[in-house]
Amino acid sequence: MSVINCEEVKRDEFHTEKYYESYNIFGAHVVTEDEIQGVRFTVWAPHAKAMSVVGDFNEWDYEQHKMLQVTEEGIWSLFIPHIEEGEIYKYAIETLAGDVILKADPYAVYAEVRPNTASVVFDIKGYEWNDKNWIRKKKKKSIYKEAMTVYELHFGSWKKKEDGTLYSYREMVEELIPYVVEHQFTHIEIMPLVEHPYDRSWGYQGTGYYAATSRFGTPHDLMHFVDECHKYGIGVILDWVPGHFCKDAHGLYLFDGTPTYEYKDKDVQENPVWGTVNFDLGKREVRNFLISNALFWMRYFHIDGFRVDAVANMLYWNKEGQEQSNEHAVSFLRELNEAVFAEDEDFLMTAEDSTAWPLVTTPTYEGGLGFNYKWNMGWMNDVLKYMECAPEYRKHIHEKMTFSLLYAYSENFILPLSHDEVVHGKKSLLNKMPGDYWDKFAQLRLLYGYFFTHPGKKLLFMGGEFGQFDEWKDLEDLDWNLHDFEMHRYMHDYFKELIALYKRSKPLWQLDHSPEGFQWIDANNNEQSIFSFIRQGDKQEDALVIVCNFTKATYENYKVGVPDFEYYNEILNSDAQQYGGSGQVNKKRLKTILEPYHNQAAHVEITIPPFGVSILRPVKTRKGSKKQDGSKTKVRSNVTSRGKR
C-alpha cells in the first residue's frame, strides 16, 4: 500500500466521504521524496493554531520542525529528511488558548513501552505472511455450521516468566499455541492489544488504536504470532473498542485543545463509571479513523474477527434518567459491518451487547445492525445465577435454565463464560458453585456439560479449563500449580474430553442457529431439577440425548423419552471416576423400550448421577420405525434464514 501525498488529498474524501484508508495518509511514514529519504508526518487537528513535530532528533524543540496546514479543515503535514525508523516523536500543538500540548500520534503504529508515552517511527510494511493455506481453508467453511470454541485470554496474565516479566509475542508462540492446540480450541480471543497506558485497564482504555502494544514486542512480532496461530489452525479474534477512549493527557482526549474525537456535549461525552469519553460517531473524520482502523488490523495483521466491546453503551445515550437510542452509533455500526464484510465475508464480527436491541446479527440490507454474532449475555447471567443458588432451591428458579430457548434463534449467539464474570469479587466459576469441595467440582463439570450441549458457539475465559479456584488476578498469571492437585487434574481431563466430544459431534453445532437443532424432552421437571433434551444434526442418525441433573440426588431406572432407535450408548458421563466423580455411570448399552414417554416414541431407563450430565448417542435405528404420531422418522429440514449472511 503506497503512502498518499497529503497535498493530493481531496478534502471531501476524509472530511465528508467514506475514506477507509486514512492510515495511508496520517501517521509517520518512512518515504523518499525528491530522492531524499525521511519521514512524512501527517495529522488532523482542526482547531490547532500551529503544529510541530518534536522528538530526540530535534531535542524536543517546538520551533525546529513546524508543520504546514494543508487543508482548511485542519490537516497538517511535514516531511523531515534524514530521520529513520526507531525515532521517538510527538506532536506539539498550539491550542486556541495559546497553550502548547504534547500528543502521541493517533495513527502511530508503534509506541514506547509504558510508562513512556511517545510514538515511534516504524515501517509496518514488509512482513512476509505464510498463511495462504489457512485463508483458503477458511473460505471453504461456513462458520455458522461449524464447531466454534473460543479461548478468551489476557495476554499479560495468562502466563508469566519466573521473574514475573511478560512473555513476548514471539515467546508466546511456544507457550500458548501448543496449549490451545492440545485443548482443541478453534479460536483465541485476546483482550485489547492496542497501546494503552494503564495495565489494569486490560487494554479497554486505549491511546494508540493503530499501535499493537509494545509491552510484548513490535508489530512484526505480533504478525508472526498470528501467522503461527494460522499455521496450526487457530483463528485470532481481537477485542476492539470503538465506543470510548481514555482521558490520558498524551492521548486522543481534547487532542487539539478542543473536543476532536469525542462529543462536545458533556451530557453524552463522559462515561463516569469508566472515566472515559465517547467517540463522536456522528463526525465523518472519527468514523473514517475507526473504520480505517478495523480494516488496518484485518489487512496488516490478518485478524480473523473482532469482539466489539460495550455495544450497549454505544446504542444508547448515557444521559442521566434517559434511555434514548444514539442514531450516530446505530448508523456507524451498520457502516462498520458493511465495510468489514466487503473486505472479508468470512470475518467474525461479534457484538458484546446486553440489550434487547433487535436484529443485531441480521445483515444491514435486511434492516439489521450487520454483526454476524452476538454474546448471549442473558444466557450467561441466568445460568450463573441458577448455578450459584443452593441446589435445594433451584426448583424455584427453574425458568432461568429454560428461558434462553425462547430466544436462542433470534440472533446468532455465542455463549460466553467470560472474564467479566470471574473478577471484581464475583469469584471464579469453580468457587461460584455452592457446597463442599467435591460438590463444587461436580457442579462445574455439570455446568460445562450443559454449556457444550446448549445451542450456540462457545467461549471460555482462561483458567476455567482446569478449575481456577481464585478469581482472575490481572497482575498475576494463572494458578498453574493447581495441576499438582488431583481434582484439578480430573477437571482438566474432563474438559479436554468434553471439548473433543463437542468437536466430533455434529449435532452439537451443525444446526446451532436453527430451531430444528434442538428439542426439549422434558423442560418441566422443576421438582427434581432435571432437564433433558435432544440436539439434532442434518442427518437423522446425527442426534444426541442430553440429561442434566442439577441436584445431588442419584436416580436409578429413571425414564427418559427418546427418539426410536434400537439402542443408545452413554458416550459421556460427568460423574465418571476418571473425572473425579462418584462413578454412577451407565456402562452397558441401553436398549430402548418401545413405549411412548415425554412425547417421544420410546424411552430408556438410566442411572442419573448426582450433579451430573449424561450424553447418549443412538446406535441402531429400527427398520421402518415410526414416531408417536404414526409418521415415519425422517431427516429434518434445516431451512432457515438465521446463520446466513
From Swiss-Prot:
Active site (catalytic residues): D309, E352
Q: Which domain of life is it from?
A: Bacteria
What Enzyme Commission number(s) does the record list for this chain? Answer: 2.4.1.18
- Claim: Disulfide bond is one of the keywords in the record: no
Name a biological process GO annotation: glycogen biosynthetic process
Q: What class of enzyme is it?
A: transferase
Listed pathway(s): Glycan biosynthesis; glycogen biosynthesis
Q: Where is this region: Disordered?
A: 619-645
The record lists the catalysed reaction(s) as: Transfers a segment of a (1->4)-alpha-D-glucan chain to a primary hydroxy group in a similar glucan chain
Key words of the record: Carbohydrate metabolism, Glycogen biosynthesis, Glycogen metabolism, Glycosyltransferase, Transferase
A GO term from the CC aspect: cytosol
Name the Gene Ontology molecular function terms of this record. 1,4-alpha-glucan branching enzyme activity; cation binding; hydrolase activity, hydrolyzing O-glycosyl compounds
Q: Tell me the InterPro entries matching this sequence.
A: A-amylase/branching_C, Branching_enzy, GlgB, GlgB_N_E_set_prok, Glyco_hydro_13_cat_dom, Glyco_hydro_13_N, Glyco_hydro_b, Glycoside_hydrolase_SF
Which ranges are annotated Polar residues under compositional bias? 636-645
Q: What does this protein do?
A: Catalyzes the formation of the alpha-1,6-glucosidic linkages in glycogen by scission of a 1,4-alpha-linked oligosaccharide from growing alpha-1,4-glucan chains and the subsequent attachment of the oligosaccharide to the alpha-1,6 position.
| Subunit record text | Monomer.
Similarity comment: family membership: Belongs to the glycosyl hydrolase 13 family. GlgB subfamily.
Query: What is the protein named?
Result: 1,4-alpha-glucan branching enzyme GlgB
Q: Which gene encodes it?
A: glgB
